């Protein structure tokens, strides 16, 4: 499983030009058992044994990848983090914790992370309702076998008070280069925060928004139905999608030379560089992805770029090379992989991009002479 890309990365979902993925996660705990952070090793192991067999028996988990955290190499754990299949916190766990992932990598269940169970469904594009439908089905199936901690007044009980209630965290990963280049992103983040939603970086809380990638999610779950949370978040994301498209078109109409220059420079550096730090690679790939969305590159090359966002991450580089690499070695290998992938990648077709924008320019950037 670790050698193949997840189905959600194929970029085939609704609004895939802006929404990379949608994820819905449910947190559950067993009644009258200590939370993982408070439980001793023997109790965590007992809880794991109680839960794991039921998870593996799910029809959706036929031929699943199922491993105890103590049996996974540190590198494999980090690969799972980079694919958003486990959290950074779960990767730090050992005996008494496990992960079960379906072969399509659209369903992931962490056992004994912060809670006894963290079930998540990932979909390409804006598909929060579909992601919730699957994880809700899994939750119902497991609840018929396990006694979950539930309070009639509060809802599902969780280790973190902010998850008490539905135990649900819904989020979408958005690619927002237009808003960043237009210097409007801070306004959007402030507006989103004021209505009770959280904005985080590439790998969640406390991480940087590299590659112009932002996670938007609900912050609290108490006193609100799952469907209401999903609907409210979906509407906000649809508004952000509109603002991102508006920002891209405004850049194309008012600052075409700047936009063409950014895309050309990104293509040039990625095509010829021999050392490439992770952050720089993500930021440049983001510009190429923007160029593709605007028509500068053929659509049939999209998967190649989307896969590079994952394949050039530190653990994936070491996994593919089958050796441990220091930061400098990773930078050289990252640049080599990008150069090799872009050998058959066409040069940016600026005239096509401008024509598709419908702003009347047909011969590339205006002359400065």
Question: What feature does the model see in each segment?
Answer:
Residues 176-181:
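Short, surface-exposed ligand-recognition loops at beta-strand->loop->(often short) alpha-helix junctions
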């Amino acid at each position: 499983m670790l050698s193949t890309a997840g189905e959600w990365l194929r970029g085939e979902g609704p609004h895939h030009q802006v929404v990379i993925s949608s994820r819905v996660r449910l947190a559950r705990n067993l009644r009258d058992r200590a939370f993982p952070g408070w439980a001793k090793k023997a109790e965590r192991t007992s809880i794991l044994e109680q839960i794991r067999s039921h998870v593996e028996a799910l029809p959706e988990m036929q031929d699943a990848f199922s491993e105890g955290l103590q049996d996974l190499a540190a590198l494999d754990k980090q690969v799972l983090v980079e694919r958003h299949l486990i959290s950074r916190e779960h990767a730090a766990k050992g005996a008494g914790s496990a992960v079960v992932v379906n072969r399509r990598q659209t369903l992931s269940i962490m056992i004994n992370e912060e809670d006894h169970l963290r079930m998540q469904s990932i979909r390409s594009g804006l598909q929060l309702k579909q992601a919730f439908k699957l994880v809700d089905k899994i939750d119902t199936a497991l609840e018929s076998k396990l006694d979950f901690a539930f309070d009639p007044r509060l809802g599902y009980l969780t280790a973190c008070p902010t998850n008490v209630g539905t135990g649900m965290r819904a989020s979408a990963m958005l690619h927002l280069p237009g808003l960043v280049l237009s210097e409007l992103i801070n306004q959007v983040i402030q507006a989103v925060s004021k209505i009770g939603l959280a904005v985080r970086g590439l790998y969640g809380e406390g991480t940087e928004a590299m590659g112009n990638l932002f996670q938007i999610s609900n912050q609290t779950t108490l006193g609100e139905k799952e469907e209401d949370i999903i609907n409210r978040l979906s509407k906000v994301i649809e508004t952000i999608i509109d603002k991102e498209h508006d920002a891209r078109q405004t850049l194309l109409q008012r600052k075409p030379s700047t936009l063409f220059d950014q895309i050309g420079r990104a293509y040039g550096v990625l095509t010829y560089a021999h050392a490439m730090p992770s952050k720089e690679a993500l930021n440049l790939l983001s510009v190429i992805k923007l160029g593709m969305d605007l028509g500068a590159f053929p659509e049939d090359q999209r998967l190649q770029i989307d896969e590079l966002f994952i394949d050039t991450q530190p653990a994936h580089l070491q996994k593919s090379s089958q050796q441990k690499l220091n930061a400098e070695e990773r930078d050289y290998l990252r640049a080599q992989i990008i150069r090799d992938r872009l050998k058959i990648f066409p040069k940016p077709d600026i005239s096509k991009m401008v024509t598709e924008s419908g702003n009347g320019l047909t011969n590339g950037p205006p002359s400065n002479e």
